[in-house]
Every structure is written in C-alpha cells, then in structure tokens.
Amino acid sequence: AEFNQRSILWDLNYFKYCFLKATGMEFQENRLEDDFLKMSDVLLRSSSATFLYRDFQSRNVMVKDGEPWFIDFQGGRKGPVYYDVASFLWQAKAKYPEDLRNELLSDYITALRKYIPVDEAYFHSQLRHFVLFRTLQVLGAYGFRGYFEKKPHFIQSVPFAIENLRQLLKNDYPEYPYLCSVLRELTGLKQFTDDIQKHMLEVKVMSFAYKKGIPNDPSGNGGCLLYTSPS
C-alpha cells in the first residue's frame, strides 16, 4: 500500500460522508471536491520511501521492560514523514501543551536528520497541511464509529477533535478557501460549541413491547431494563 491521491481522496470523502453530512450542514459538493483535489496535490508535493504507521497514537504504544512496542499498524504503508508526526502530536484527546508539542517536534526533526536532509522551514510549512488532513480523517472515523455504529468512545471524542480543528483554523489555509469556510461553519454549530466539561449524564425513560422488538440502546454499553408488573 502507498500514500497516494486515491487514498487521500478516500479519507477526505470519508470525512465528508461520515461526518460532515451527518451534521445536516449544507454545502456545495463541487467546490468542496475542488479543494480536496488541491489538498491532495499539496500533500503529494514531497514523498519519501518511509514507513507511514498511519494510526500512530499513544494508545497504540505499549511499554514493556522500559521499551516501547507498537501495535495496530495494519494500516501502515509507504508514505511521507509528516503524517505520523501529525497523528501523534495532534491526537484529539491528548491535548498536548504547545511547548511540549514543539519540544517533541524538535526532537523528531533532530532524529530525522540522521537519515535524510531536513529543511526545517519547509518541514513546518508542509506539516500543517498534514495536521489538517489527519484531523479530517479522524473526524470521518469518529463519525462512522460514533454516529453510525453508535460506539460511545468515538462520540465522546468528537468535541476534542473539533477543538483541534478550531485551533488549526486560527491560521489561514489560503490553498483551500471553500473547505475552510465550511470547516469554520462546522466548528460553530451549536452541538459543537458546548463546553466539553459540561456534558452531563443523560437518563432516558421509555416503555416498550417485545412484540415490536428489543428496544435500541444508543449508548453501546448495554443499558438497563426495568420490568414492572401491571397492578
């Protein structure tokens, strides 16, 4: 497998169909697709014959005897060196402080120079596009696993990814004007503007009859059924 235009557009459309459309937002698909194509061109400006882990995040790094071991790399492929940095340092729920993120990024560039020449200014300019791309891919995954498969962990992760996106959009991406306007509207939707810390326990009480089937449990954790006998 290889990081190429097909895989890029697949991920961007994953975001469009599994997350963006699920919000009910209206947008012009042809203009959005134009910016998707522009993004694929930007991401493919520099390629390297390196291993791209793809799902590189802290939960996939296990420590055994003081040494890191890596799991869940079946999505790995040949690709550019920027993607995994974006995946790890901008993972939605980690909320790394800016100082720590910059320190880790500096360490990465220093280590990378042992293998290939690195123009640090160009590296940073290219990395920001991969961070945006990875954030959209993650939202697509959260949309599919959360909104469609009803898995609560992914639904709970959405506000963190939206906040990442909100922070990214503070710096302009002139290459993708329409995409950015759509994303700014997305981050301003009411369901994404609530304080992450204010989410409270929700209890739903309803009646059902077995002849109509087993009631749906949207929480994904089994719920609780209370039986009462008629008086």
Where would I find each of the regions flagged by the language model?
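All-alpha amphipathic helical-bundle segments outside canonical DNA-binding/catalytic cores
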Residues: E2-F3, D119-V131
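N-terminal low-complexity segments that are often proline-rich with Ser/Thr-Pro
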Residues: I214-L226
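Conserved small/polar residues in nucleotide/adenosyl-binding loops
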Residues: Y227-S231
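Extended, well-ordered alpha-helical scaffold segments
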Residues: Q28-M39, L104, F154-N164
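Active-site activation/catalytic loop segments of kinase-like enzymes and analogous catalytic loops
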Residues: N13-A22, V81-P117, H129-E149, A161-K170
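Active-site acidic catalytic loop and adjacent metal/ATP-binding pocket
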Residues: M39-V85, A92-Y96
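ATP-dependent phospho-/nucleotidyl transfer catalytic cores
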Residues: A1-Y53, K64
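ATP/Mg2+ or Mg2+-diphosphate-binding catalytic cores
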Residues: G140-D217
